[in-house]
Amino acid sequence: MKKLIYLLVLLLLLAFTACSEKDNPSEVKILGYKLDQFINPDTVRIHIDTQAEADLEYRSLFAYEIVSSTDGFSPRQSAYAGYDLPWETFSQGYYVPNDDHRTWFPGMGLPSAFKVRNAGLFRLYRKVDVDAGNRGSKLIELRGLSTYTVDNWSDTAEDAIKLSDLLQGIAAYDSVAFVAVDGYSKNYQPELINDGYYLLNSEVTTFPNFNSTLPGNMKKFKKLAKINVYGATSAQNFDFALAPQEKADLTFTIPSDLSGFESTEMVTEK
């Protein structure tokens, strides 16, 4: 009788263990920290304009490079990546200290190069998106373009880029719409684009040969975020250079003390 009871207990324990393993597979729970927490919105806003409205997302005006603190590696150097991330992608990533301080972008389909080991800092580069509809789109880092010295609206020399350089690779088009960070937009014809510049520090356009005849809201378009291209006859077949690292607009580091940051429990099966 005792042997029978012992056998029944043993069978129950084995059944319980089997069910437990089935219901709870081997999982490792680790903490991740959303990357957007490491990019201070006020610092970015003030860099764009000290008088800028605080309720707008100025971090969307930049491309983001993730850099290793040990060997300086970034996805820019990888043959499988070779680019920086827009805010919409970067902000959804995580910093995971328990996984060799790597960055994770779960479910986003990014190349493995973006899983940067010992991630230590982020470099920000001012960019503009150019959207030619079904002809494709480009993310263009402004400091990767040729710069020119142009008089700004205070009659002081300032670095600027040609507006036409943002449309390199498009054979012809009918018109464009400039879109600001707040969604405000204005249409421009090719002759204005070919004449105009974007002042990199003032964050405003100027059209040297047309300023005297243009209304203020056209000649001084501020905080350019995007260009919509209408009537493009071709895709934008041009390989834009990334901005040099030494010309990064802003840099943020990951602190060693993360006690002031919100963590997210992340689950991965081993």
Residue ranges and their predicted role:
Residues 9, 13, 231-233:
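N-terminal regions of proteins, emphasizing targeting and processing segments when present
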Residues 1-2, 20:
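N-terminal hydrophobic targeting signals that begin at the initiator methionine
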Residues 21-270:
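N-terminal intrinsically disordered, low-complexity segments enriched in P/E/S/T
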